[in-house]
UniProtKB/Swiss-Prot annotation:
InterPro entries, per the entry: Ferrochelatase, Ferrochelatase_AS, Ferrochelatase_C, Ferrochelatase_N
Positions contributing to Fe cation binding: 196, 281
Protein name as catalogued: Ferrochelatase
Pathway terms, separated by semicolons: Porphyrin-containing compound metabolism; protoheme biosynthesis; protoheme from protoporphyrin-IX: step 1/1
Amino acid sequence: MSRVGVVLLNLGGPERIQDVGPFLYNLFADPEIIRLPSPALQKPLAWLISTLRSGKSQEAYRSIGGGSPLRRITEQQARELQSLLRQRGIDATSYVAMRYWHPFTESAVADIKADGMDEVVVLPLYPHFSISTSGSSFRELQRLRQADPAFEKLPIRCIRSWFDHPGYVKAMAELIAAEVRNSDDPTKAHVFFSAHGVPKSYVEEAGDPYQKEIETCTGLIMKELAVQMGHDNPFTLAYQSRVGPVEWLKPYTEEALEELGQAKTNDLVVVPISFVSEHIETLEEIDIEYRELATEAGVVNFRRVRALDTYAPFIEGLADLVATSLQGPEVSLDAAAELPNKVKLYPQEKWEWGWNNSSEVWNGRLAMVGFSAFLLELISGQGPLHALGLL
């Protein structure tokens, strides 16, 4: 029987307060998170942003217990998936590969080789593909694969995205239905999907399918929810976690919540649609920041649907994805990360100016550089704005 290594890709998160700064640095040093005209700017900007954001981020992590639960939850998902696959007769071993914190992707690759796996299935714990999530993780794994002949020779199957998988859709609808039923009037409960945002240019310039997959996914979930509830509910899709001066996908969660509050929405059921595990963006950003904002805006009852975590139907859906992948052809990391031929995604060490991009992308990049220079002057206390008496 073939020994199958199942690699679960995820973001990672700081487990202690002292990990926050290094985690943020790793995050913003990734050119798929912030794109700059030269790789020489990436690390200095990552240092600057992580330094400036570290204090506020540390406070956020303190508010949820001092660290992210993401690793613990992801490892539990891996164990339960492994157990279920073995019950189905698949000799599988699960490995967690985090992009920006421990256990890093390099660790997963080392363990796969040490355990003598015969083939690999790569399963991102991001239901919806994006350059900045699954795409970045695929590229990192590909970089390691190309540098390691022993790993490169293993057959590999990559699952690009699974936003429309029936098991996932049904599991989400079940968790939403549980909260809708707790509303004062379940027929009028407003379902609010809050997805992690991405820069608008990713979609319009690079052809990132993220927005389309999110929109399709919410439609499928609402259709399944109607089947389970016996009626339709109003719903909204918005995008959270915007960073920097460039335009991101809209509507923004903050603005959408304010509008619903002004409309005197009585029952709001908030769904963290991009996230399959509890972490800082569910426990702090949604549960604390957005709850307060919505309440102040006029929302009466704010309920948040829990993340999937180790919900049994969800784990069964993941097992179905792996089993189906094993029955099909090999799918390379390059193929999984492929985008429409609008913009070439350069290797990180060869990132170049995007001469063929629109002026909006140029403006975004130049704005980021200018914004960085402004922040640097604020920190140093020296520069042209100080010389002119403007600061």
